[in-house]
Amino acid sequence: MSDSIKIKAIDEVKISRYIIKQTMEDWMNFVENDVVIVGAGPAGMSAAYYLAKHGLKTLVFERRLSFGGGIGGGAMLFHKLVIESPADEVLKEMNIRLEKVEDGVYIVDSAEFMAKLAASAIDAGAKIIHGVTVDDVIFRENPLRVAGVAVEWTATQMAGLHVDPVFISAKAVVDATGHDAEVVAVASRKIPELGIVIPGERSAYSEMAEKLTVEQTGVVAPGLYVAGMSVTEVRGLPRMGPIFGSMVLSGKKVAEDIIKDLRNS
């Protein structure tokens, strides 16, 4: 090796000790949170950005080992996506470059969109942990509310092993899991007292879907919120396809709703 390159020598034991120590410190810190967001797609990461920017302790769980949700797949794997106003203001705030194609309509590169959205959320103070699946919620009575989540390693679930989860508390839980609204679905099935009915997502009607998804983002039951494509599933709205304005605006709106609700609680 060249004498001009001085690489710090660190053995395998130290590597393991540092990783385990710092990881456990993070988990101990994030057992209690202001907000837990399930899903690191465009809505989840937008929500994380605005919540953390406001000073709320925000934790995002993502079952995969990557960011972005549906951004990366784009439209039939094409690497360009559509953003419409006023969502462009959110992307500009995060220094994501846009190409204007007509008044109020922009094209964004999917890789840049994912990377800078994640970086913005992290820089604002949100913690994102990959490879973790949320498979249940915590609830409380008097008053009835959702009070956190149960989590398991995604790899453990994929292996089909019977392993109990650990519990993470939160004043607000956001389902940003996408088309299946997985967290709300579990709460609906296992806590019928919440009175949640899920009509399911409808077929495509982009103009209607973009508007209604943002408008109907918000609380589903005390302590439980929906954002992004989870909104279409829970509210019975149409899908919109590879136009992502409503996703980032939905994330921003759910953050604003939670900030207001926690302030008033």
Swiss-Prot record:
Its EC number is 2.4.2.59. Glycine binds at R239. InterPro entries: FAD/NAD-bd_sf, Thi4_fam, Thi4_prok. Fe cation binds at D164, H179. NAD(+) binds at A43, E62, R63, G70, V134, H162, V163, D164, M229. GO terms for biological process: thiamine biosynthetic process; thiamine diphosphate biosynthetic process; thiazole biosynthetic process. Belongs to the THI4 family. HAMAP family: Thi4. This is Thiamine thiazole synthase. It comes from Sulfolobus acidocaldarius (strain ATCC 33909 / DSM 639 / JCM 8929 / NBRC 15157 / NCIMB 11770).
